[in-house]
């Protein structure tokens, strides 16, 4: 038989047993929560273990796996993504923004090697693509501003010429200044006279002096200073004459001056490539070459030199002449100068004057690629020797 509850409903087997109203105060029994909606449950819950030990619940021990911590990546990548997302969001807002930009070019290198694409940003600001990465610190050199006094002091130091540029410089003969042929350069400078311009006196009708009664008054003369007396007694200064241009000197005048002066002077004498004279004899054996014939026999053939090579060997040069007197200089009454080399006559004329310095240097080379250079003197004049064709033709017709 099944028992019913207070409400008259049958109880299910194995379910919680209904409590009676009279059993509310029993010890160790927890009443079931009332089903009436108007009643609240008790604040303190009752224990059904009847004072026994609580049952332990066992939980499995899970072994935690150790994971090796990897170094964190730089946060700059996230920052770049955030900046790009912001730029994309900004481009979408507003009117006329975020439009695609098209750049047309004919070649790859048309914009130049250092030209970079520029992206249009907000607030009408151009942003380089290179600026999208992490910002780098740029050290800007600060220029020091000079005051007016420092600038004036630098100019004074530049204008100075009373100091030695090299403090360790010593007086050495090898460091002497170069001499240039500017002895007649004084005519380039203009000198002004200190005396005021005096108008020339024009001769006119002679005027008669008017007779005037001279009063008998004597003027007392004051003593003069020594400087004034010295100026009065000093002779007048001679007027400086500006040197004129150097005169064109003929060969005859030059040779006469050189014969009268005691100082020795070097002359540059230009001679023809080929000189009259006998070239030195050279014992040269003929060159023989072996040629194999059709029959297999070897034949020796002498090779003769070309005509030009023979003429070059028969020519006489200055190096082929012996040391000593080469010829004679003849000075005619007309001023013509000739050089006699055996039976050949050469005309001697003045060469073109040089505007630079010429020196005769003797160079002596050693075996170990070293040598010495000795300056023998300055060369001031140049003489050119050319063949006299009239005398050559007369000598040929004879």
Curated annotation (Swiss-Prot):
Residue spans of biased composition, Basic and acidic residues class: 66-100
A Gene Ontology cellular-component term: cytosol
GO MF assignments: chromatin binding; DNA binding
Modified positions (N-acetylserine) in chain numbering: 2
Region described as Disordered: spans on this chain: 1-114, 220-244
Modified residues (Omega-N-methylarginine): 95, 97, 99
Location of cross-link Glycyl lysine isopeptide (Lys-Gly) (interchain with G-Cter in SUMO2): 68, 78, 141, 152, 160, 190, 199, 206, 220, 285, 302, 310, 396
Cellular localisation: Nucleus
Record note on modification: Sumoylation on Lys-141 can serve as a signal to mark misfolded Pol III for proteasomal degradation.
Stretches assigned to coiled coil: none
Keyword Kinase: no
Family: Belongs to the eukaryotic RPC4/POLR3D RNA polymerase subunit family.
Function: DNA-dependent RNA polymerase catalyzes the transcription of DNA into RNA using the four ribonucleoside triphosphates as substrates. Specific peripheric component of RNA polymerase III (Pol III) which synthesizes small non-coding RNAs including 5S rRNA, snRNAs, tRNAs and miRNAs from at least 500 distinct genomic loci. Assembles with POLR3E/RPC5 forming a subcomplex that binds the Pol III core. Enables recruitment of Pol III at transcription initiation site and drives transcription initiation from both type 2 and type 3 DNA promoters.
Subunit structure: Component of the RNA polymerase III complex consisting of 17 subunits: a ten-subunit horseshoe-shaped catalytic core composed of POLR3A/RPC1, POLR3B/RPC2, POLR1C/RPAC1, POLR1D/RPAC2, POLR3K/RPC10, POLR2E/RPABC1, POLR2F/RPABC2, POLR2H/RPABC3, POLR2K/RPABC4 and POLR2L/RPABC5; a mobile stalk composed of two subunits POLR3H/RPC8 and CRCP/RPC9, protruding from the core and functioning primarily in transcription initiation; and additional subunits homologous to general transcription factors of the RNA polymerase II machinery, POLR3C/RPC3-POLR3F/RPC6-POLR3G/RPC7 heterotrimer required for transcription initiation and POLR3D/RPC4-POLR3E/RPC5 heterodimer involved in both transcription initiation and termination.
Entry protein name: DNA-directed RNA polymerase III subunit RPC4
Upper classification of the organism: Eukaryota, Metazoa, Chordata, Craniata, Vertebrata
């Amino acid at each position: 038989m099944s028992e019913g509850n207070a409400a008259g409903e049958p109880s299910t087997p194995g379910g919680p047993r209904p409590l009676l109203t009279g059993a509310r105060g029993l010890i160790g029994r927890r009443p079931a929560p009332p089903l009436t909606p108007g009643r609240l449950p008790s604040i303190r819950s009752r224990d059904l273990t009847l004072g026994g030990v609580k049952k332990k619940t066992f939980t499995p021990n899970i072994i935690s796996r150790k994971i090796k911590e990897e170094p964190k990546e730089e946060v700059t990548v996230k920052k770049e993504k955030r900046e790009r997302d912001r730029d994309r969001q900004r481009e979408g807002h507003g009117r006329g923004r975020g439009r695609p930009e098209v750049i047309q070019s004919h070649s790859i290198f048309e914009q130049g090697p250092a030209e970079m694409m520029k992206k249009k940003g907000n607030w009408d600001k151009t942003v380089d693509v290179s600026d999208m990465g992490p910002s780098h610190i740029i050290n800007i050199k600060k220029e020091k501003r000079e005051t007016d006094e420092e600038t004036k002091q630098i100019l004074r130091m530049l204008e100075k010429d009373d100091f030695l540029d090299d403090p360790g410089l010593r007086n050495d003969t090898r460091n002497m200044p170069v001499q240039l042929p500017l002895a007649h350069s004084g005519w380039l400078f203009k000198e002004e006279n200190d005396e005021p311009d005096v108008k020339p006196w024009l001769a006119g009708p002679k005027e008669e002096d008017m007779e005037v009664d001279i009063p008998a008054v004597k003027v007392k003369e004051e003593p003069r200073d020594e400087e004034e007396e010295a100026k009065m007694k000093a002779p007048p200064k001679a007027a400086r004459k500006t040197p004129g241009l150097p005169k064109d000197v003929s060969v005859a005048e030059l040779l006469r001056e050189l014969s009268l002066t005691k100082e020795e002077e070097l002359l540059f004498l230009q001679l023809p490539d080929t000189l009259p004279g006998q070239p030195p004899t050279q014992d040269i054996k003929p060159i023989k070459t072996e040629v194999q014939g059709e029959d297999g026999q070897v034949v020796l053939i002498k090779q003769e030199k070309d005509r030009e090579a023979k003429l070059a060997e028969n020519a006489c040069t200055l190096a082929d002449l012996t040391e000593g007197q080469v010829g004679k200089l003849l000075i005619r009454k007309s001023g013509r100068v000739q050089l006699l080399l055996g039976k050949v006559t050469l005309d001697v004329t003045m060469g073109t004057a040089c505007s630079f310095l010429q020196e005769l240097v003797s160079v002596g080379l050693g075996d170990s690629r070293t040598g010495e250079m000795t300056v023998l003197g300055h060369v001031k004049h140049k003489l050119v020797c050319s063949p006299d064709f009239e005398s050559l033709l007369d000598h040929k017709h004879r």
